[in-house]
Amino acid sequence: IPFVEPQAWHRIAAASDDLECYLSFYCKPEDYMAKKYDTRAHSEVLEAVQSGHIKPGRTLDLGCGHGRNALYLASLGHDVTAVDVNNEATQRIQMIADEENYNVRAGYYDINAAALPESETFDFILSTVVFMFLDPDQIPSIIKNMQERTVVGGYNLIVCAMDTEEHPCTMPFPFTFEEGELKNY
């Protein structure tokens, strides 16, 4: 089956009267949500998946925002729980997930509470571009809670602003990680 390069014009011209065609558009999973819903998965999430470390399983997106990571992972077969303090955003995620027939449960959760239900465990917990907006005093409890809710052999992925001598953070975030800080957890 021939592929036409992305963003290229194409035209099918009949060489005879009996030409029959079937045209379908192919899209990589990482591009589908971006093209259809304007929500692209974070590059670190893409890298974790494409490296083979993250396999479909029970996934928690902490601070899911508009669902860029939750929807991408659900499209790959993950069973996703997506939580955020923005109810409008989680309602939109749930609507999209239902339209796409993805296994997603989206709802309200305040990450600062560090109180994920003891009855739930996950293979993969991620939080991208969220920690720098959280209460700095709660970070140790939040990370401990994430670790307690992650199955043995599971993964946690945190993407957060850092403040190092070489690359000082110029934004006035309430929290940034210091170099090597996560080694303490």
List each language-model region with its residue ranges:
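Conserved metal-binding segment of the jelly-roll/cupin
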Residues: 2-9
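Fe(II)/2-oxoglutarate
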Residues: 3, 18-20
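Class I (Rossmann-like) S-adenosyl-L-methionine-dependent methyltransferase catalytic domain
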Residues: 8, 22, 26-56, 60, ...
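A short SAM/SAH-binding and catalytic strip from SAM-dependent methyltransferases
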Residues: 124-138
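Short beta-strand His + acidic residue motifs that chelate non-heme Fe in jelly-roll/DSBH
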Residues: 10-15
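A short acidic, Gly/Pro-enriched loop at the edge of an enzyme's catalytic core
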Residues: 116-125
